[in-house]
Amino acid sequence: MPQLLLLACLLIIVTRVAPRALDPCSAYISLNEPWRNTEHQFDESRGSPLCDNSVDGEWYRFTGMAGDAMPTFCIPENHCGTHAPVWLNGSHPLEGDGIVQRQACASFNGNCCLWNTTVEVKSCPGGYYVYRLTKPSVCFHVYCGHFYDICDDDCHGSCLGTSECTCAPGTVLGPDRQTCFDENECEQNNGGCSEICVNLKNSYRCECGIGRVLRSDGKTCEDIEGCHNNNGGCSHSCLTSETGYQCECPRGLVLSEDNHTCQVPVFCKSNTIEVSIPRDLVGGLELFLTNTSCRGVSNGTHVNILFSLKTCGTVVDVVNDKIVASNLVTGLPKQTPGSSGDIIIRTSKLLIPVTCEFPRLYTISEGYVPNLRNTPLEIMSRSHGIFPFTLEIFKDHEFEEPYREALPTLKLRDSLYFGIEPLVHVNGLESLVESCFATPTSKIDEIMKYYIIQDGCVSDDSVKQYTSRDHLAKHFQVPVFKFVGKDHKEVFLHCRVLVCGMLDERSRCAQGCHRRVRREASTEGEDASGPRSQMLTGGPISIDWED
């Protein structure tokens, strides 16, 4: 009877020699555009809003008419040459602090931090700052610069010899001992606010979450008891009931997860993103995406916009444990500016940020069986989806023609060609097959497992990995085998795939083969806070092992 032969592990160690890092205080890119300054207010009649889509993880310094440094207070929307200006939500570091991380926030629609990301900041010996800025996940976002006041007249004591400048209330003296920077009151005890503290220029304010309002002290929050108080916190309709109140949305809109805000439904699929907007909400407006050639099509009741991860100016980025695809629906009046057809006050336009989130980590399972259903991973939801991966069984080592309707019955010592295939080819992303294992049943938690790949390393030296032009695709060849026992005539494959950004040298994908000293007791289990896994089950692989 054929037996399962366990082969020796092959450990491949790749040593990288990192180039010597340059000091960002002397190796930076200057941002000197005048429209970046906080004093520059965006005017719709003079052009389109700008977007920092060329900023991509380098070190930058604000110079010239752009300003001295990033503002550390909330900037109103429609400033810095764009709709959503980005400011630094935290104080600048001292020179001795080295490189620190700070949150950067984009202001829009009355929310000082509607979108946020993490940037790095360093104080340089010349009295200036440099910033490592990430590319915004959506447009229209611009990193702002600001001119801070120079304190060269007001001094403590004698101004002869060693003078010490003083700054106005709400500001602090910078490291150059001349510039007055805004003081971030929110960094100390949250500004005394019970919930949200928003730093403003030379001041701050307290805010409350959805369904809550500030008390008269301006610092503590209390629950909204019903629709009579600020419409119950509802963005649209508030209905009173015997047990309390509830928010409702107009026809065609859906209630968001906060149960107070109505929003346009977004359908995130594996290969398409669809936005469906009720026509009566956008009457007189022409809708288009970041790439203005992608426009909405009306079906009589709704205006629908269909696009993919690679089209219409969609920005794809890796954020923590998710792949985030973003775009912006813009609606402009078909009439002349300022006409009664405008439905958005102040901007005379409709702006709908569209975001789909896809988990980075997948577990996909497959086997060989006639009439195999090999559908791509796919979930339809308002704002979440599954990045389109599928596990394919190929006919040969060219990995060009997969089996579709029927799969052959394989014999021992035949070669099995399989691959992890993306159905959408997106630049800037790469994948890592963290693990592949076989089981005699379709259960992923089957006790009997045989690892082909583990911790990103090939565990069986009979396995061959092929290179691919697509950084998201992975191809493998393995000799056909079966599990010990006459009843085990089937084999199922399960692979766990992780998606990363190609430019992130510290990502798990960049580490490649990475054997852990001690494996956790439940390797295939997922921590509740970790990346989510999705399952695609097929199979089984039928083995003809009779001679």
From Swiss-Prot:
Q: Name one GO cellular component term.
A: extracellular space
Give the Gene Ontology MF terms in alphabetical order: calcium ion binding
**Superkingdom of source:** Eukaryota
Compartments where found:
Nucleus envelope
Pfam families named in the record: D8C_UMOD, FXa_inhibition, Zona_pellucida
| Stretches assigned to the EGF-like domain | 182-222
Q: Which positions form S-S bridges? A: C186-C197, C193-C206, C208-C221
Briefly state the protein's biological role: May be involved in hepatocellular function and development.
Give the range the annotation lists for the signal sequence.
Answer: 1-19
The answer to whether keyword Calcium applies is: yes
Keywords on record = Calcium, Disulfide bond, EGF-like domain, Glycoprotein, Nucleus, Signal
ZP domain residues: 267-516
Against SUPFAM superfamilies, the record matches this protein to: EGF/Laminin, Growth factor receptor domain
Q: What is its main location?
A: nucleus
Glycan-linked positions: N89, N116, N299
Protein name in the entry: Oncoprotein-induced transcript 3 protein
- Chain intervals for the UniProt region annotation (Disordered): 520-547
Quote the InterPro entries the UniProt record gives. EGF-like_Ca-bd_dom (IPR001881), EGF-like_dom (IPR000742), EGF_Ca-bd_CS (IPR018097), Growth_fac_rcpt_cys_sf (IPR009030), ZP-C (IPR055355), ZP-C_dom (IPR042235), ZP_chr (IPR048290), ZP_dom (IPR001507)
**Quick check: keyword Cytoplasm in the entry?**
no
Question: What organism, scientifically named, is this protein from?
Answer: Bos taurus (Bovine)
